[in-house]
């Protein structure tokens, strides 16, 4: 897996985290326990820090990047759907960022929120806790019920299990045969 230091900053990845073999992690990136970065994911901490909490999952082909000195923070139990783009944003614990959603610079997502698939969260936008935000640009559509917001935690837990299964299934090149 491509893991690169940048200007003296090295990625720090917890031993229990799983990084797909073709994910790329660069620079000032910290990834917490039981978190995962799936196939094609890119975390570029080259111009500022990226902090990924515990039990987070960054799904296939998602990109996380930052501007100078502005961090990108994912608190614990955050799910980032396939092909999402996060740019120096702060995502609260237990939130779900839908597939192909874009979170622009300095946006803040409150804990337990759902950012709908394809949504575009504007630069500097603040999405309150337990909100459903959708659209281009994203607007808060409604507050989520507590049980809806709580459902994102087991979703993140399922990805902990899936990452462990992926890790166990990896083959060395010597184990792959071609006809």
Where are these regions (language model features)?
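Glycine-rich hexapeptide-repeat left-handed beta-helix
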Residues: 1-12, 46-54, 60-62, 66-67, ...
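A cytosolic small-molecule/anion-sensing beta-strand core signal
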Residues: 21, 33, 39, 54, ...
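N-terminal segments that cap or nucleate solenoid repeat domains
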Residues: 1-37
């Amino acid at each position: 897996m491509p893991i690169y230091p940048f200007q003296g900053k090295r990625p720090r990845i917890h031993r229990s985290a799983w990084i797909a073999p073709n994910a790329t992690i660069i620079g000032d990136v910290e990834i917490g326990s039981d978190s995962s970065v799936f196939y094609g994911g890119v975390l570029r901490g080259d111009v500022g820090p990226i902090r990924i909490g515990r039990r987070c999952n960054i799904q296939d082909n998602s990109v996380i990047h930052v501007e100078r000195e502005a961090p990108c923070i994912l608190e614990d139990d955050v799910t980032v759907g396939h092909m999402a783009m996060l740019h120096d944003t702060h995502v609260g614990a237990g939130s779900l960022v839908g597939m192909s959603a874009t979170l622009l610079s300095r946006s803040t997502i409150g804990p337990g929120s759902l950012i709908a698939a394809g949504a575009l969260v504007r630069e500097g936008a603040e999405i309150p806790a337990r909100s459903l935000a959708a659209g281009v640009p994203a607007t808060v559509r409604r507050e989520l019920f507590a049980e809806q917001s709580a459902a994102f935690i087991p979703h993140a837990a399922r990805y902990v299990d899936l990452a462990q299964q992926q890790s166990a299934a990896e083959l060395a090149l010597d184990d792959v045969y071609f006809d």
